[in-house]
């Protein structure tokens, strides 16, 4: 990889974090869908609040709570500090940590420390490597896979599907041919479970079944409702080229808000366990998770754990990451108590009701 291309990637990574922290890049025409559902109150919970246990299991590992610090950053100098903060918080709470795209670890050996630092500060929790679908489509060598996994002693490998982001990205790679074939090969050869995630446009039930057929063990739905990476890349495009993107004004707003709401994604993907041969995969709910209440709703819809990137990035930047996570876990404890459930694993769809369902 040439120095110029590597430098472009470094600058892009830096821009992503800066834009997410300082610009309005959320969905403004749709929500994650959690506002459409609420829990049925249990006036007789018959439990003691102090008996509530948030611990659960994920990919066969016990974790302290059903929350993951989701994939966000790495591959540039200042990412080391952010990833250290993420790692320290993950270790403190005993929760999984996803790493940002590790393409830079393959392109530029000088940027490896920004990824490797997470295992130094999170030695005992599940940590997940991450690479993009375009890189998978081109075929990852055994050496590439070894670098990704060994650098952080990864417990799983995330493959992120980001077609909309690549479409808007000034230097984006929009060749998504052969992703599924190469994903199947990856699942058959990699020594750790493979997780497939979107980055904010969601994964439908139909798409989920295709990647499960390929051998994927976990689906992170990453639905619409949180960060719109189309907006992030649109800002970069305008800054670089000093003009609007190549789409018509009539279509642009819809494309910037393109995606399936997170709650719908969870419900669709979860239903596959009832209607297909795939019964043992796990679901991560991300995309617009803003509280422990959203996590609770995700679990009741069928997710195993919830995850957040954007909200926790802001918290880490403001040095209040552990405080934010603790608040979210308190939210979750409150929901468990008020539904009469003593653990996250016991939340079910029957605890939910559509807000606008007719009374009679």
Swiss-Prot record:
The gene is fni. GO terms for biological process: isoprenoid biosynthetic process. Homooctamer. Dimer of tetramers. NCBIfam families: IPP_isom_2 (TIGR02151). Its EC number is 5.3.3.2. It comes from Chlorobium limicola (strain DSM 245 / NBRC 103803 / 6330). It comes from the Bacteria. Mg(2+) binds at residue 166. Belongs to the IPP isomerase type 2 family. This is Isopentenyl-diphosphate delta-isomerase. Substrate binds at residues 12-13, 101-103, 165. FMN binds at residues 70-73, 101, 130, 197, 288-290, 309-310.
């Amino acid at each position: 990889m040439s120095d110029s291309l590597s430098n472009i990637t470094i600058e892009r990574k830096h821009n992503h974090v800066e834009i997410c922290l300082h610009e309005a890049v959320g969905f403004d025409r749709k929500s994650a869908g959690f506002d459409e559902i609420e829990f049925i109150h249990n006036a007789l919970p018959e439990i003691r609040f102090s008996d509530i246990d948030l611990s659960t299991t994920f990919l066969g590992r016990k974790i302290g709570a059903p929350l993951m610090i989701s994939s966000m950053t790495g591959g540039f100098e200042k990412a080391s500090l952010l990833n250290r903060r993420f790692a320290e918080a993950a270790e403190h709470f005993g929760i999984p940590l996803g790493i940002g795209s590790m393409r830079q670890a393959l392109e530029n050996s000088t940027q490896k420390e920004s990824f490797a630092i997470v295992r130094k500060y999170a030695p005992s929790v599940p940590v997940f490597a991450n690479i993009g679908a375009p890189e998978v489509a081109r075929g990852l060598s055994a050496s590439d896979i070894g670098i990704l996994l060994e650098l952080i002693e990864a417990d799983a490998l995330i493959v992120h599907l980001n077609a909309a982001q690549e479409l808007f990205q000034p230097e984006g790679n929009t060749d998504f041919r052969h992703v599924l074939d190469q994903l199947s090969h990856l699942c058959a050869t990699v020594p750790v479970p493979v997780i497939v995630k979107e980055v904010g446009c969601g994964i439908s039930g139909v798409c989920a079944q295709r990647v499960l057929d390929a051998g994927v063990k976990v689906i992170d739905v990453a639905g619409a409702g949180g960060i719109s990476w189309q907006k992030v890349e649109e800002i970069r495009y305008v800054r670089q080229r000093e003009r609007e993107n190549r789409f018509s004004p009539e279509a642009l707003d819809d494309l910037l808000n393109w995606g399936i709401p997170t709650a719908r994604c969870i419900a669709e993907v979860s239903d596959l366990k009832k209607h297909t041969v795939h019964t043992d995969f796990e679901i991560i709910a991300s995309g617009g998770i803003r509280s422990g209440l959203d996590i609770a709703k995700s679990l009741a819809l069928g997710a195993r754990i919830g995850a957040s990137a954007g909200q926790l990035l802001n918290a880490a930047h403001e040095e209040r990451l552990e405080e934010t996570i603790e608040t979210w876990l308190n939210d979750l404890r409150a929901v468990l108590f008020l539904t009469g459930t003593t653990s996250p694993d016991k939340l079910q769809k029957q605890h939910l009701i559509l807000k606008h369902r007719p009374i009679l």
